[in-house]
Amino acid sequence: MSTSQAEHTRVHPRRRPLKTAPPSLSASTSIESCVADSSSSSPNLSLRKGETFHSPSPPPSDDIDPVLSFRSLPQRSPTCTRSLEAIAAREQRMVDYLSNLNLNSLEPSSPLSDKDNGDDLPVPRAILQAHIDSQSMADRVGRPTQSSELHTPSKVRKTHCHASDSGLGTSLSSENMSASDKSKGIFFYLLNLQPHFLFANMLVIVKAGQLSFESQSSAKATTRMTQSAITSSISAFDAKISQKRQLGLPACKQIERLIIKPILREERLKPFHPLVQSIPQRIVDREIGCLRDLEKTLLWLAPVSDFQKRNGVGCIAHSFSRVLKNYAASRASYLRFCEFTIQCLHTSVYHLNERDQRLPADRPYTNGYFLDLVAQIRRYAAMINESRSSMPSNREPAQNGAKASAPKYVVSPPSRWFARFNIVRSEHITLEGGLSKNGRPAELVVHKDGEMISLRTGKPYEENAVPAMKRSLSLGSVDEGVERSMARRKKNAPPMDINQKCKDCDKVFKRPCDLTKHEKTHSRPWKCTEPSCKYHEIGWPTEKERDRHINDKHSKAPALYKCKFAPCTYSSKRESNCKQHMEKAHGWDYVRSKHNGRNSKKASNGATPQTPSIATPSSKAQGITTPLTGSEPSPFEPVTAYPPNPPFSFADPPTQTGSGDFPLFTTNSPFEDLAAGVNDFSPLPTTSLDFQAFQSQLEGADPNGLIPLTFDRQSFDSGSPVPDLINETMGFDTSPVASTDSSSLNFDLAWSQLDAQNVEEEFTTLTMQMLTPEHSVSMSALNSFSRDPSISNPSPLPVQKVENSLYTPDSCHVDEGVSDLFDSGYQHKADFMLFDQHTNFGASSVNMSSTCQLSALHNSNQMFPSLNTPDLNYMTQGWPQDMEMEHF
């Protein structure tokens, strides 16, 4: 083998020489040049199968450059001049592209030609997604009620919803679309707008992350599954892997009964009825998987517009609120809807289990959660109201004198439903400051007319301002009193001099209050109201002295204080003088507010006798004790009572029989009338709900608890199928109850068709109080215990009114020291029974009325045998070994 052949075999595929020159950056890339190059090229050149992965055959030796063909060197150095020029050229092209997009102005940087209005510019994803969502909602409303076969996930494909072309072909030719069709679509309006107008000055709320799935089998009947931005993530949705949980039959019935129907019955909430009518279809499409998803959909989509134009284009929320219809016309209507919805949500919490209420990672429904939700709703309503009131279309352009200034607000491009919007041109927001930049916290700043205004304070932003410190850095400026109050006093420190001297005299006071009182004797701030009086300038140290002076000297009708001892006629203008008179002349006990020691030597002559104690009605009934209140039965359990003169028997206790006692709750509830049909059921009155009282109950209750319902609600009959609540009465077709589509929920399923395990799961996870069934009802699904006493571990005894749980000492695990007190060698045979199994509990209960069964079930270890049947072995029966009867 030659040396040249060995050298060629060691050639790396990525190290092979470059046959053609690199394309020039400034060269023309027109189609004509490409065609010319292809036509002028050699026809012998062809693409071989292994050209990409294998080293080509070596070129002729005449064409090899000895420098470029040196195998140990790369083709081009990273610091090559041509590489640097290519990088600089790319950066220059990017600068040229960005210079054409001015995001802060609506004025075009260069005139647009006709070719710029074509399809070369991609449609913004937000606009395209809103258009797709509107078509999806239109298909939902217009979907036929007939059942359609649910396609398997293998036949479902993703619809191409990207704004740009993939390059692999097109589904619709532009020549096939007429000009009239283009003028009706939303793309005709969007392509007339500037790119910076679309991206910078348009506020769009869309369902981010929504994906559409379309079946290939039928062009008319399509099945769409969407993801909402409120209840789902933005990640891609896989129909096979991530199937969101669907609400079950009981949860859908409760939501329809407690949330959908009450809102649809409210005439004042009529603007929000389209949103509520879309809830059943959202549940079917798995957009709503729990009560928390329903809450977010109702509360956060309430101010969003869903108006359908005549061309079928869905409108976009928040940005066209003055042109199109919105759910919330005002802040008051939105708050009214949210308050009513929150009360319905609070009611439905008691009728749904934890799995249907929220996800495991979500915050549970408590009083604190509802209070936070109310505060968040009101703050959100205030933000929406503020944004709508401060829209550019609501404000007039600024004018300077008689001549208007430069147009601050400009009109959008000539589209009729965009023409009413004025967009602010010169306002933009930036993030200024930072601890690493100027030592101040970062904050948002609005640039408006060359002025910077802080959004945090609303004042002009000063970029070079000195950052404020919490404490002064100068030690000399700190007050001594501040140091003493902020620092803890040292141990064994000498006492501080707290004596303060008066500034006007030489008196020293230990207390600051005494010093303040003394200083008023020098300032005398209380002046007389009479200008001619000398005390008008001198004044009095206290207000009381000033009032007494005016009453004595200047009052025309002074208040006189008369002596209370008749027939004495003494009177004085001063109350203190009258009291001193009664004390000296009549021996009255003058109790002064401040004891000065003058009355301590003499005793009181006219002491007031003590009032004799008078017995109150409650003091005579102290010996009567309050009787103990027994346990009350459940309201849904029939009223029971013991029969008079029951027969005495330990083994056969008296059973309860029905009596004519009054019921605890009325049977005719205003919300329990099911005879007229479920469609007439009105769980929420329109005038009796006071949200302020509801909020007060939440604030006064435990934040981690949940206040009970204020009125009773009756559930559906568990044995009858669910009727159609919405299709005929409410008047919309997208209810899962009325839907006969196989892809929707099966609402014709009755309780009897569910598995027993599912029934127990639904009942054990409920937060509401369980209803006590009657003894005559067979509990085949919930009765998991056996009533056969022959089994070693019998079930608990029937419910009694007293505690009767008896067990042997060896039936539980005890401590090591305590176990020494019992006989370890004793082996008990069986535990004795205190009460007999007489009450019938379903099919598995034991009939204790037969004599033969009593004798068969009799245990030799039983403490008290039955007295109703003769037992020959009764006299010879021995007592149990674990009992010692000392006194019988």
Swiss-Prot record:
Zinc fingers (C2H2-type), renumbered ranges: 500-522, 561-586
Induction: Expression is increased by itraconazole treatment.
UniProt effect for mutating H518A: Impairs DNA-binding and leads to itraconazole hypersusceptibility
Entry keyword Zinc: yes
Compositionally biased region (Polar residues): 23-32, 167-176, 388-397, 602-632
Recorded superkingdom: Eukaryota
Molecular function as annotated in GO: zinc ion binding
Alphabetized InterPro entries for the sequence: Znf_C2H2_type
Entry keyword set: Metal-binding, Nucleus, Repeat, Transcription, Transcription regulation, Zinc, Zinc-finger
Protein name (record): C2H2 zinc finger transcription factor sltA
